[in-house]
Structures are given as structure tokens and as C-alpha cells.
Design a protein with these regions (language model features):
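Extracellular attachment/recognition segments
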Residues: 1-84
Length: 84
């Protein structure tokens, strides 16, 4: 397994954003997860959903929707793990 950060983002309070990343080999098993980089205690800060587009026979595009669950702006990293 290997991991990385694909992008960094910021969402205003209670906002939702959508990002995409393309050209991922269709044979890879990729897991996406978001990590807030703005500390805040007491409750979850973000939630996300992942949708997949089979762009061609060999590649995928991932569409990631991220929702800020707080009233404050949140900075975060869009991270991935490629499972072996």
C-alpha cells in the first residue's frame, strides 16, 4: 500500500465543494479520505462522498464531494491510499 495527498482545499462554513482527479489506472484499488488541517474540538468537521467515472477502458476519474459540517471555514487535505 502507498498513500499521498492529491490536493489541499478550503471550505467556508457549511459549504460543499466538488473536486475531480483523473488518469488513475482502472486496475488499482484506490481509497479516498479527507483530513482536516484546521484543528477544532468537539464534533466532526467534514464529510465526503466519492463517485467514479470509467473514463476509458484503462483509466478512472474520481469525483469527490466534500461537505463542511461546521459554521467555520475548514482547511483540509484530499488524501488517497492505493491498496496492493
Amino acid at each position: 500500500m502507498w498513500t499521498g495527498t492529491q490536493w489541499t482545499g478550503t471550505l467556508a462554513g457549511n459549504a460543499t465543494g466538488r473536486w475531480f482527479t483523473f488518469g488513475w489506472p482502472a486496475t488499482w484499488h484506490v481509497t479516498w479520505y479527507m483530513m482536516p488541517t484546521s484543528p477544532q474540538i468537539g464534533a466532526p468537521q467534514i464529510d465526503w462522498e466519492v463517485a467514479v467515472e470509467r473514463a476509458d477502458p484503462n483509466a478512472c476519474t474520481y469525483w469527490i464531494t466534500v461537505r463542511n459540517l461546521t459554521a467555520n471555514a475548514v482547511n483540509f487535505e484530499g488524501r488517497y491510499a492505493v491498496l496492493s
